[in-house]
């Protein structure tokens, strides 16, 4: 489960909306792949949605919009979980407030579900340390 990054610092915009449209005809429940929405404190699952054809999910993007499909896909090798993701951004008129200039608003934040065996790499700080300089282009690291 994760919450998406909010600010795109390089173009001074803020993501405010996510739209996910699923394109999978005849998706079977036993294949997993259901998207889950979790509460702000990650204490309970609020809802889940099958990735079946024409199912659509629209939600606000903020630091507490916890979502994802955490269970391993078990569909046949010739089947893929297909979706279209659209994001709506607004321009930030002023420079970002100092309290927002924290790393967590510029990266996806991975979160562990309670009472699960979600892997340790889901910890945001450990993940960030592992990938920061190894994989990110230099322009992401400026400022």
Regions found by a protein language model. Give the residues of each.
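Catalytic core of Fe(II)/2-oxoglutarate
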Residues: 6, 10-15, 28-142
